[in-house]
């Protein structure tokens, strides 16, 4: 049975803001902006009717590139965030537990960061 070495998943509407930055996989979209526009254009329903999801998605990729390293020069000009879903190829892994673990780690990181700020 053939399986890919890695499986990544992206979240379109929220952009994985509930995943710790060090657990995000950075997908560099910089070299092919024309490809990103063409892929977005395939979904006409997302472009017509007054909502320009194509422009919003492009703007998010640009913002991700800038905000990915807040204290360093930009490495990318366009960036998508993904998460590693490879462990889910093992059918014994419960998807809800797998995702909840990401949320739990994010929650712990937020509490730790806030705690450090108040101890000063």
Q: Can you annotate each of these PLM segments?
A:
Residues 3-6, 10-120:
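C-terminal accessory domains and tails appended to enzymatic cores
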């Amino acid at each position: 049975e053939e399986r890919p070495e890695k499986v990544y998943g992206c979240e379109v509407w929220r952009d994985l803001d509930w995943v710790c930055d060090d657990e995000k996989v950075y997908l560099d979209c910089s070299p092919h902006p024309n490809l990103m526009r063409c892929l977005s254009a395939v979904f006409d329903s997302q472009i017509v009717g007054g909502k320009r999801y194509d422009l919003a998605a492009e703007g998010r990729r640009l913002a991700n590139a800038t905000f990915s390293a807040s204290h360093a020069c930009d490495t990318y000009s366009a960036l998508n965030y993904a998460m590693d879903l490879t462990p889910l190829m093992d059918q014994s892994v419960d998807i809800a537990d797998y995702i909840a673990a990401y949320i739990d780690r994010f929650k712990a990181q937020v509490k730790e960061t806030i705690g450090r700020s108040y101890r000063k």
